[in-house]
Swiss-Prot record:
Belongs to the thymidine/pyrimidine-nucleoside phosphorylase family. Type 2 subfamily. It is an enzyme of class 2 (transferase). It comes from Legionella pneumophila (strain Paris). SUPFAM superfamilies: Nucleoside phosphorylase/phosphoribosyltransferase catalytic domain, Nucleoside phosphorylase/phosphoribosyltransferase N-terminal domain, Pyrimidine nucleoside phosphorylase C-terminal domain. Signal peptide: none annotated. This is Putative thymidine phosphorylase.
Length: 517
C-alpha cells in the first residue's frame, strides 16, 4: 500500500510502500525447508493488503527478511495482532517469542520471468540461471514455482551448455573449498541401491595411499540410510568447515555430512522439491553431482552408476547418456570425471539400514571371513579407479594396489584414524526386535526388488533408528530351502516391526524364487 499527501507547494508526494507490524507467537510447526507465515482470517493486515491463502509475503524482522507463503488460521490458535511462522521461517529470521515483524508485498520476481522463458522452450543464459538459483536459495521462489522450473528443465529440455551454466550457478551459490594438494579426488554413487556403502571403504584406501579425498555425504531422505547416517554410527559427521579441513590435512580424508558445510546449498532445495514431485531429470542430476564435487575442491571424480530395473538408472541407454553428460560437462568445468557402470540389479552386502550397513563395512575393512564379497569387490574397483587418477599409479594397476592396502590392514588403520580425528570411534548398536522372513518353497533367488526392500527397512525405523533395517541372507542366483530365512527385519520398537510386517503381507514379490536348475 502507498500513502500520498499534498505538500506545502501543492505537489503530490508519494511515500514508500508501507508495511504492517504483527507480534510473533511460536507455533512449533515443521515444514522442512518451506517458509510459511500463519495469520488470522480476520487479521486487519490481510484485509488492508489483500492477502489471501497462498499469497507470497515479504516478512521482515530487524535486518533480516524472507518471503513466506500465507496460511490462514480460522481457529483461536492466534490472538488478534499475532502471527506465526513455520520453524524454518522462524530460524531464518532468528525470531524470538513476542518479536514484531513487518509484512508487505514483495517486489516482482525477475527469476519467475526466466522460469517462463524455460517453460516456452528457450535457452537460458548463465546470468538468468544464476538469478533463478539465487532466488531458490533465498526462498523467494515458492516450491510450486521451483517445481515449474524443474519440470521445464526435465526430459532432455536442458542443452549441454545449459547444464554447464546451471552447474556453475549452483557452485557460485555457496562456498568453494580449496586445498594445498594439486590432486584432490572425490567419489560419488548415483544411488538407488540399498547397502552400497562403498564410500566408507574407498576413502580410507585412497587416504592410506596418500591421495587427498575430502568426502562430504548426504543423509537419507527417501532411502533407509545415507552414507552420512551409516558413518554416524561409527563417528561424528556434523563437522564445521574448519574441523573438516583439520581432519583432511591430518589424515588425507574425511567422511562428513555435507549439510554442515555450505557447498552448492541450492542443490539441497532442488532435490527436496524434485523428490516431492517424483521427478528425475538427467540435466538436474548432472548439475547436482558436479556442483557438489567441484565445490568440494575436487580435481578428479570417480562416479559409480549402478544400472538395474529397480535402481535409479534403470537401463543401459540412460546410463550411457548420464556417463557422457557427466564426463563432458565435468571436463568443460575443469573436473576430470571417470564413470563406472556397475550392476544395480540387487542390494549390496547383507545390511540395509545405518548400523547393519556399518557392520558390513567393518567386516570388509577388518578382513573378517563373513564380510560380504560383493561390497568388498565394488569398493576395490572404485578405489582402484580413484588411485589411477594419480600419475604414480599405472592404468590397470589401481585395483591390485587398493587390494594390498585393504588386505594389509592399512586401510582399516586409516579408517580408525579418520574416525578418531572426527571426534572418536563409536560402538555399533543392535536392534531390540527381529523377525525372520522365510522362503515359502525351495528354489533359486531370481529377482530382488530394491525399492520394496528399502521400503520395509524404512517402515522398520531406518534411518532414524540407527539399528533398524534389514539383514539380507540370500542374493540373486543363490539356492534356498523351504523355511530358510531370506532376510531378517530389525527394529527398535514392536510397533514399527508390525508396520514392516504389514507391508510384507501386501507385497509378496519382494524376493522372487525360481526353480532350482
Amino acid at each position: 500500500m502507498h500513502h500520498s499527501f499534498l505538500s506545502a507547494n501543492g505537489g503530490i508526494v508519494v511515500s514508500k510502500q508501507t508495511s504492517h507490524g504483527l507480534r510473533l507467537k511460536h507455533l512449533g510447526i515443521k515444514t522442512y525447508h518451506e517458509a510459511i507465515i500463519y495469520m488470522r482470517e480476520d487479521c486487519h493486515v490481510c484485509h488492508s493488503e489483500g492477502f489471501e491463502v497462498q499469497t507470497r509475503i515479504q516478512v521482515t524482522l530487524g535486518q533480516r527478511s524472507i518471503i513466506a507463503t500465507l496460511n490462514v488460521v480460522t481457529s483461536e490458535l492466534l490472538q488478534p495482532g499475532e502471527a506465526g511462522l513455520s520453524d524454518y521461517a522462524w530460524e531464518s529470521l532468528h525470531a524470538k517469542e513476542g518479536d514484531e515483524i513487518q509484512v508487505s508485498h514483495p517486489k516482482p520476481l525477475e527469476s519467475l520471468s526466466y522460469v517462463h522463458t524455460k517453460i516456452y522452450g528457450k535457452e537460458l543464459s548463465y546470468e538468468q540461471m544464476k538469478v533463478i538459483i539465487d532466488d531458490v536459495l533465498s526462498g523467494r521462489l515458492s516450491d510450486v514455482q521451483i517445481s515449474a522450473f524443474l519440470a521445464a528443465s526435465s526430459a532432455g529440455r536442458l542443452t549441454r551448455t545449459e547444464i554447464m551454466k546451471l552447474t556453475k550457478a549452483m557452485i557460485d551459490s555457496g562456498d568453494r573449498l580449496s586445498w594445498s594438494s594439486p590432486l584432490v579426488v572425490d567419489k560419488h554413487c548415483v544411488g538407488g541401491l540399498p547397502g552400497n556403502r562403498t564410500t566408507l571403504i574407498v576413502v580410507p584406501i585412497v587416504a592410506a595411499f596418500g591421495l587427498m579425498i575430502p568426502k562430504t555425504s548426504s543423509r537419507a531422505i527417501t532411502s533407509p540410510a545415507g552414507t552420512a547416517d551409516t558413518m554416524e554410527t561409527l563417528a561424528p559427521v556434523h563437522l564445521s568447515p574448519q574441523k573438516m579441513r583439520q581432519v583432511v590435512e591430518q589424515e588425507n580424508g574425511c567422511i562428513v555430512w555435507g549439510g554442515a558445510v555450505s557447498l552448492s546449498p541450492a542443490d539441497d532445495v532442488l532435490i527436496r522439491v524434485e523428490r516431492a514431485i517424483d521427478l528425475d531429470s538427467e540435466g538436474q542430476l548432472v548439475a547436482s553431482i558436479l556442483s557438489k564435487k567441484i565445490a568440494t575442491g575436487a580435481t578428479h571424480a570417480v562416479i559409480d552408476i549402478p544400472v538395474g530395473p529397480t535402481a535409479k538408472v534403470r537401463n543401459q541407454s540412460m546410463a550411457l547418456l548420464l556417463k557422457q553428460l557427466l564426463e563432458e560437462v565435468g571436463n568443460e568445468l575443469g573436473l576430470v570425471v571417470r564413470t563406472l557402470l556397475t550392476d544395480g540389479s540387487q542390494p549390496v552386502g547383507h545390511g540395509i539400514g545405518p548400523s547393519l550397513e556399518a557392520r558390513d563395512v567393518m567386516a570388509v575393512l577388518q578382513g573378517l571371513p563373513d564380510a560380504p564379497n560383493d561390497l568388498r569387490e565394488r569398493a576395490l574397483t572404485l578405489a582402484g579407479a580413484a588411485l589411477e587418477c594419480s600419475s604414480k599409479v599405472p592404468p590397470g594397476l589401481g585395483k591390485s594396489i587398493a587390494t594390498q592396502l585393504l588386505d594389509s590392514g592399512q586401510a582399516f588403520k586409516k579408517f580408525q584414524a579418520i574416525c578418531e580425528a572426527q571426534g572418536g570411534m563409536r560402538e555399533l548398536t543392535k536392534a531390540r526386535f527381529t523377525y525372520p522372513v522365510v522362503a515359502a518353497k525351495a528354489g533359486k533367488v531370481s529377482l530382488i526388488d530394491n525399492r520394496k526392500l528399502a521400503k520395509i527397512a524404512k517402515l522398520a525405523g531406518a534411518p532414524k533408528s540407527k539399528s533398524a533395517g534389514i539383514d539380507l541372507h540370500s542374493h540373486v542366483g543363490e539356492s534356498v530351502e523351504k523355511g530358510e530365512p531370506l532376510f531378517t527385519i530389525h527394529s527398535e520398537s514392536s510397533g514399527e516391526l508390525h508396520y514392516a510386517c504389514d507391508l510384507l503381507r501386501d507385497k509378496q514379490d519382494i524376493i522372487i524364487l525360481g526353480e532350482n536348475s
